[in-house]
Amino acid sequence: MDVGFLSSDLFTFGLIPVLIFLARICDVSIGTIRYIMISRGFKFIAPVFGFFEVTIWLLAIGQVMANITNPICYIAYGAGFAAGTYIGMELEERMKLGMAIIRLITPLPTEDFIARLRQYGYGVTNITAQGANGEVTIIFMVVKRAKIPHLAILIRDFNPHAFYTIEDVRSASEGIYPIEDKNNPFSIFKRPFLFIGKRK
């Protein structure tokens, strides 16, 4: 590379800040996913992400220290951190890692709805409880987070104004889950077969 370009204002105030910004996006995005993996029990994958995260961070902070009198580098460093945090959360949401527990509370009759859930292969636990306005049914399900959109559709079909909550689950030792055809990612919507066993 031309030595003159390396000492030019374009390189110092343009290219270097851009590289710092991109490096921060990468390492913070990886760090966000790593933290979520740790919280959800992916203990063997998280260290791999940690290695790349800290390596990229060292490259970024090294350039900041090498250009410590360049204020644009500080702006790029902070902006990259903010953008990386947002992008990391978006990536994790699209990856749909881990398990979740869905808790549905309804005063409506649930026999047909529960039968439909079980037909699709979901493990359902239901109990009768007392709500503010009378008797209600509480339905519990532990599912892969990738299945939440499908369950949300089923719940809206059952009751468009249903009250339900979704919480992360670190791990699930045993349970009933839909079997998926690996050649058809949409097979869950067609096959009511079950898998009984461990899910991590």
Curated annotation (Swiss-Prot):
Q: Pfam families recorded for this chain?
A: DUF2179 (PF10035), DUF5698 (PF18955)
> What stretches pass through the bilayer?
3-23, 44-64, 71-91
Where is this protein localized, as stated in its record? Cell membrane
Q: What is this protein called?
A: UPF0316 protein Mhun_0543
Top-level lineage group: Archaea
Q: Would you identify the family this protein belongs to, as annotated?
A: Belongs to the UPF0316 family.
Q: Answer whether the UniProt record assigns the keyword Membrane to this protein.
A: yes
One GO cellular component this record assigns the protein to is: plasma membrane
InterPro entries reported in the protein's UniProt record: DUF2179, DUF5698, N-reg_PII/ATP_PRibTrfase_C, UPF0316
- Keyword Cell membrane among record annotations: yes
Question: Which species?
Answer: Methanospirillum hungatei JF-1 (strain ATCC 27890 / DSM 864 / NBRC 100397 / JF-1)
- Mainly resides where? membrane
What NCBIfam families does the entry give? PRK04164.1-2
- Name the keywords, alphabetized: Cell membrane, Membrane, Transmembrane, Transmembrane helix
Write down the membrane topology.
Multi-pass membrane protein
Signal peptide start and end residues:
none
